């Protein structure tokens, strides 16, 4: 239940959008909280802001904007805490011609945990391990030259590219052979049909 109440603290209970810099959690005089976008929409239709839950009125002086209402400190505290249960989905194209959603583990010290199993969502026996390599900023390819890790992994990449290219070539050759075989059958049948109507000479 704690997760549900914590999740409900993270989103506006009117529009069910998560709080963000654009949708700030604003505290009304009655101590209820909703996002600044919903409050702005309520303000356009009314002079004062009326709480949708208790109908309490929050008076705003003339020229006073909804953005000038105080932010809810409890909600800001919950938003500021990193949640270990949240993962950003990353799509990685694997050599097995599949695209899978992989939740990458997150740590406070390092962005990614190297050597962790990343492919937990693969079906059955198709589990594959994913090793994450953290490259220092000064060695990244955009800033000149390939990093040493990339140079070491280059033969592996070439092998994967060669094997996928070879399997593609084999597939094309196999399909071409099947089509030639079927064409031969069709032509043979057509020649047999045309022989039925020819006049056989006797003699």
Swiss-Prot record:
Catalyzed chemical reaction(s): S-ubiquitinyl-[E2 ubiquitin-conjugating enzyme]-L-cysteine + [acceptor protein]-L-lysine = [E2 ubiquitin-conjugating enzyme]-L-cysteine + N(6)-ubiquitinyl-[acceptor protein]-L-lysine
CDD domains assigned: RING-HC_RNF152
GO biological process: apoptotic process; cellular response to amino acid starvation; negative regulation of TORC1 signaling; positive regulation of autophagy; protein K48-linked ubiquitination; protein K63-linked ubiquitination; protein monoubiquitination
TM segment ranges: 167-187
Entry's localization field: Lysosome membrane
Summary of subunit composition and partner proteins: Interacts with RRAGA (inactive GDP-bound form); stimulated by amino acid starvation. Interacts with SEC16A.
Protein name: E3 ubiquitin-protein ligase RNF152
Organism: Mus musculus
């Amino acid at each position: 239940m704690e997760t549900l109440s914590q999740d409900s603290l993270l989103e506006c209970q009117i529009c069910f959008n998560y709080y963000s810099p654009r949708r700030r959690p604003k505290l009304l005089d009655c101590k209820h909280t909703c996002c600044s976008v919903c409050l702005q929409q309520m303000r356009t239709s009314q002079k004062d802001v009326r709480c949708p839950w208790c109908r309490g009125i929050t008076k705003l002086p003339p020229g006073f904007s909804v953005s000038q209402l105080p932010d809810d400190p409890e909600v800001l505290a919950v938003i500021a805490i990193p949640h270990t249960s949240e993962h950003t989905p990353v799509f990685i194209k694997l050599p097995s011609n599949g695209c899978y959603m992989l939740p990458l583990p997150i740590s406070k010290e390092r962005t990614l945990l190297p050597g962790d199993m990343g492919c937990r969502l693969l079906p059955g026996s198709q589990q594959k391990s994913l090793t994450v390599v953290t490259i220092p900023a000064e060695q990244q390819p955009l800033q000149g030259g390939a990093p040493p890790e990339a140079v070491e992994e280059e033969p592996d990449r070439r092998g994967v590219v060669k094997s996928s290219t070879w399997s593609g070539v084999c597939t094309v050759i196999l399909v071409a052979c099947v089509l030639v075989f079927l064409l031969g059958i069709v032509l043979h049948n057509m020649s047999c049909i045309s022989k039925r109507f020819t006049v056989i000479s006797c003699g």
